[in-house]
Amino acid sequence: MASRAGPRATGTDGSDFQHRERVASHYQMSASLKNEIKKLIYAHLVIWLLIAAQMCVSHLKLVSKDLVAMPYQWEYPYLLSLVPSLFGLVSFPRNNISYLVISMISTGLFSIAPLIYGTLEMFPMAQQLYRHGKAYRFIFGFSAISVMYLLMVVAVQVHGWQIYYSKKLLDAWFTNTQEKKKK
């Protein structure tokens, strides 16, 4: 469309963006942290499915005990670790602070605590494997201790980052609620 100033009206060439509003930083942070936490929850779901599959296969005796070892005691309470992740997912759509706090606390209780107990439970067998090279439990030909410790290292990192990002998300949400109260 032509104008008096030339072939294009002034301000329509894309140079008028400086005055436009921007998204507040805590909203940007909230969106990115929700995305990161969702990725961690999906990683946790994969770990949970591996442990649940190992437990189902061993309890239902689908394969011999030589192929898949019986589960350790820490694996049973770890199965409850799916509940905190569900609370975390439920808290996202409406920025529900109480569900996120429940998710953070129960992640420590149902996820981190069983992993710490599992580390202590398997330590004597890991020591025996290290000193004498003897393993008595196997998962598909690999030492069950080695496989479970590897899984535990990944799980601790996933849950640790999940709690860290949840705390940062909680701070971003509190910033948002404090600004609303001031108005």
Swiss-Prot record:
Sequence ranges on the Cytoplasmic membrane side: 1-39, 93-99, 159-183
Topology, Lumenal side: 61-71, 121-137
InterPro entries on file: Jagunal
UniProt signal peptide: none
GO CC annotations on file: endoplasmic reticulum; endoplasmic reticulum membrane
Main localization, broad class: endoplasmic reticulum
Chain ranges passing through the membrane: 40-60, 72-92, 100-120, 138-158
Membrane topology: Multi-pass membrane protein
A Pfam family that the UniProt record links to this protein: Jagunal
Organism domain of life: Eukaryota
Location in the cell: Endoplasmic reticulum membrane
GO biological process: defense response to fungus; endoplasmic reticulum organization; granulocyte colony-stimulating factor signaling pathway; neutrophil differentiation; neutrophil mediated immunity; neutrophil migration; protein transport; vesicle-mediated transport
Keyword Protein transport: yes
Keywords for the protein's UniProt record, in alphabetical order: Endoplasmic reticulum, Immunity, Membrane, Protein transport, Transmembrane, Transmembrane helix, Transport
Family indicated by similarity: Belongs to the jagunal family.
Task of the protein: Endoplasmic reticulum transmembrane protein involved in vesicle-mediated transport, which is required for neutrophil function.
Protein name: Protein jagunal homolog 1
Species annotation: Xenopus tropicalis
Lineage: Eukaryota, Metazoa, Chordata, Craniata, Vertebrata
